[in-house]
């Protein structure tokens, strides 16, 4: 009977330790999962902070400066059309170059709206199709379309992207890498430049709005 009691005692003791080890194992596993979850949450928070900083300290300010300068460009061109002085033309060239500079800086992050909405090729296709431009502007009704109230929409819908964007405006404003002389830009080309600059402005603001929310 004593031997049987010993056997029972050993069996109970073994069961107790077995349950204890299992409980410890479960506790350790739970602690490990909690620790890993905490680390993952910390990583996610760090990544979110990096992304937020990239968007609001790099992307948004870049597109904002580009958009503001593109808006100034349209105003400059309209002012030059009313008052064709060299100072007004130089101001348009200055704002064009500033907007273009910010666009070139943004080429480091052409993902997102620039690619999703096809804005990159829309405003930066090269080369400009000069023969097609001459042919288009040879028709009076085409010039009238670009000179209406919806001049920017007309540019977007009537012109192909080989006639749009920075290179289209640049062709009108500059010659041999320098601002053209005041009074040398034909009226039809000035109408074209204003319309294309308006479409360019719209695309720049679309980029900004897409990132800024």
Label the predicted regions.
Residues 34-213:
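Mature extracytoplasmic or organellar-lumen-exposed domains after removal of signal/transit peptides
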Residues 1-11:
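Bacterial N-terminal signal peptides that target proteins for export
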Residues 25-28:
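Bacterial signal peptide processing site
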Residues 19-23:
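C-terminal motif of bacterial Sec signal peptides marking the signal peptidase cleavage site
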Residues 14-18:
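Alpha-helical transmembrane segments
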């Amino acid at each position: 009977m004593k031997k049987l009691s010993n056997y029972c005692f050993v069996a109970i003791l073994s069961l107790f330790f077995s349950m204890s080890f299992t409980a410890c194992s479960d506790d350790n596993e739970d602690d490990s999962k909690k620790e890993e979850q905490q680390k993952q949450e910390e990583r996610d928070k760090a990544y979110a902070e990096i992304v937020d900083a990239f968007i609001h300290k790099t992307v948004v300010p870049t597109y904002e400066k580009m958009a503001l300068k593109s808006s100034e460009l349209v105003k400059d061109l309209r002012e030059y059309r009313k008052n064709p002085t060299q100072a007004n033309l130089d101001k348009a060239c200055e704002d064009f170059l500033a907007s273009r500079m910010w666009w070139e800086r943004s080429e480091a992050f052409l993902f997102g709206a620039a690619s999703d909405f096809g804005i990159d090729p829309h405003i930066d296709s090269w080369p400009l199709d000069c023969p097609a431009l001459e042919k288009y502007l040879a028709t009076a009704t085409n010039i009238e379309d670009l000179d209406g109230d919806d001049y920017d929409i007309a540019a977007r819908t009537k012109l192909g992207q080989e006639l749009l964007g920075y290179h289209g405006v640049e062709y009108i404003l500059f010659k041999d890498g320098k601002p053209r002389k005041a009074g040398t830009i034909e009226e039809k080309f000035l109408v074209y430049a204003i319309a294309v600059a308006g479409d360019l402005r719209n695309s720049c603001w679309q980029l900004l709005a897409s990132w800024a929310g």
